[in-house]
Structures are given as C-alpha cells and as structure tokens.
Amino acid sequence: MTIRALLLMSSTLLFGTAVMAADDAALVAGVFNPPRLAPDFSLRGSDGAELKLSRYRGKVVLLAFGYSSCEAVCPITLGVLAQARKNLDAAAGQLQVIYITVDPDRDDAVRMRTFLGGFDPSFIGGSGTPPQLAAVRTDYGISVSDKIPVPGGGYALNHSSFIYLIDRSGKLRALMPYGHGPDDFVHDVRILLKQ
C-alpha cells in the first residue's frame, strides 16, 4: 500500500469519526461514550416469533420497558413513540420500537400484542419467564419495585422509564429520559439513520 493510499484511508477514517462525534454531540438524549454493543436477548415476541434484538440490525431501535396495566407513564411513553414514528414519514420503516414487559405475571405475548397494537401495530412487545425478564432488566439497568397494592384489587409497579436508542449496527448510542416529546425522538432517530 502506498503512502498516498494510507494517508487517504487515515483521513477518511478521521473524517468519519469526526462526523459521528459531531452528530453524537447534536443528540438530545444522553450519549453513551463510547457506544457499546447492546446486550442481545431472547424473549417471546408479541408477533409470535422469537424476539431477539439482533433481528433488527439495520434499523434504529427504541427499546423501552413497561407493562400493559400501567395507567400513567407507560401509555404516555407509547403515545409519544407512536407519534414520533408517524412523524418520521417515509423513514418510519427504518425504526423499530421494542417494548419489554416488567410484569411477567400479567403480560404474555397476546396481551402485549393487543396493548401495543392500540398505539402502533409495528411495535413489538417482549415477554418471558420472570428469570428471563430479570436477566434483560439487569443487562439494561432497569429497576422494578415490588407489587404495590391498589384500591379495588390488583397492583401497580414502579420501574425505570428511560428509553434506549440503539443504532443500526446494534450499539447503544443514547438514553432518553421520560418526559421528552416526539420531536426529540424524531431528531435523534434521524441523526442515527444518517450514520
């Protein structure tokens, strides 16, 4: 390899790194620096297939955790994500929302499909055994409270409510806390889609 070829390759690599760093700085969400590979998992998907994160390489993934009986934070989050996906217009097909339950006692694949379908039929839910779900929560730093009794019977759960932004190569790129609107997700997803 000639010196000229080496210099060209080095400058291209440096330029690409600089562009990615500049794009990361423009993200609204908190950035993972450096990005790291998102832990894969194997759960029951609400679409009837095995749910593996690696199945969605080539798409940007928004990974969230919650449960179908949640009455406040979860439906608001899913409404925001549905609006963001809609606002992506033609790029919507390059985004996958994955929503993993924190309530294995009540959320099976059928219930997750019905619940998520009310927001966007493209959303995929993940359910599984308590040990399977606990392992995924540990990998992603998701905490869940013990069951909190509610008037009239039943229970509620408190849980971490941030959303992971995973790029097309399967790397954790950013973490969006609860409370951001659709425009912030659209902004960050468009940046990740350019890379």
Indicate residue ranges for each PLM-predicted region.
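Positively charged n-region of N-terminal signal peptides that target proteins for export
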Residues: 1-5
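Bacterial N-terminal signal peptides
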Residues: 6-16
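N-proximal helix/coil linker or "cap" segments that precede and/or mark the start of modular domains
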Residues: 18-40
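Short loop/turn microsegments at loop-to-beta-strand junctions
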Residues: 38-39, 61, 160-162
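A short beta-strand-turn-helix
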Residues: 41-61, 85
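Short active-site neighborhood of thiol/selenol oxidoreductases, capturing the structured segment around
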Residues: 54-77, 81
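Structural microenvironment flanking redox-active thiols in thiol-disulfide oxidoreductases
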Residues: 76-136
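Thiol/disulfide oxidoreductase modules built on the thioredoxin-like
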Residues: 132-188
